[in-house]
Amino acid sequence: MTSKGSDAASRKTGVVKAGLKELAHYLGVSQTTVSRVLNGSAKDYRISEETQQRVLAAAAKLNYKANALARSLRSKRSKTVGVMVPEISEGYSTAVLGGIEDVLLLSGFFYFVVSHRHRSELLREYPSLLMSRAVEGLIAVDSAIEEDLPIPVVAVSDHHHRPAVINIELDHLLAARYALEHLNRLRHREIAFIKGQSFSSDTLARWRAICKVAAEIGIEINPRLVTQLEDHGLGTEPGRAATVRLLERGVHFTAIFAFNDLAAIGAITVLREAGIRVPEQVSVVGFDDILSAGTNNPPLTTVRQPLQEMGRVAASTLLQMIHDDKKDWPKHPIRVLPTFVERQSTAAAVQ
């Protein structure tokens, strides 16, 4: 089909694919500026955050797609990165991947995703396997990197800090404060806690934050009201099992603060099966704000991690590292902030 025919087809379908020239003209900036934003080197040239956001928004609006094949042939680079996740299912990893994809595709990068399913041998083997595919960098999502690698590495929620790895982390103290102060205002004093799985990088950091904030605001943590998600099981099942254990202990509680939304949804299911009404008798708070949190019955009160933002920051940071020959990389973790989402799974404690 000729170019003229392609334009006509685009108008007919309503899909217009803009190139670098069209983007630059639309924004009133140079093609060089647009290119530097899209290939992740904006900060090297001190391009303002406002301009970066305008370029990314316009690229999405105008359906810009970088010609990755042509670029890679010219530069003799793979234009690919690797992404390691614990598992691919609804929730944390999927949301982070969405943010990573937003940035990489606009920048003309392709990515390989591998799921280690918490198997230590796969955690060790996957970095080498990905490097054998000529990836230029690696993003590890809730996955500990056990050795230094010869390529740039960005970690999302890996609290085992390594000098050569840039970490994207949530402010867990602020997250714990949001949840516990909310329950405290609702006069909850007997709070049950469902901790994360032993393999999760966030488990210890989040629990330490909870203990610190609880001590500050005068909430006493009863050890018999603390349980932990089992390392096996998928979806809501670990949360269901943890809540069954809490009920079997026979210790009264008026609220549950769960490690994640899937655990909280599992807890609500078990409470309902036991004839306990949420939130009239027991309030439940989750963590993450996954898609099903808002559609659950009742809609879940939760601490929202900006998961897609964390993915976008991770991908943007990795691209900057790939393009930065001087290795002038951040020396400290990049911290993102949570927000609190109050829905219908919490209410005042029954005195």
PLM regions with names:
Residues 141, 156-158, 170, 194, ...:
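Generic beta-sheet signal
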Residues 1-77:
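N-terminal helix-turn-helix DNA-binding module of bacterial transcription factors
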Residues 1-15, 19, 76-181, 185, ...:
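Alpha-helical recognition/docking segments in bacterial nutrient-uptake
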Residues 28, 107-108, 187, 218, ...:
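Glycine-centered short loops/turns at secondary-structure junctions
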Residues 190, 221-225, 277-284:
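Short acidic capping loops at alpha-helix termini that bridge into adjacent secondary structure
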Residues 86-95, 114-122, 168-178, 194-244, ...:
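Hinge/beta->alpha junction and helix N-cap segments in small-molecule ligand-binding domains
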Residues 242-351:
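Flexible loop/turn connectors
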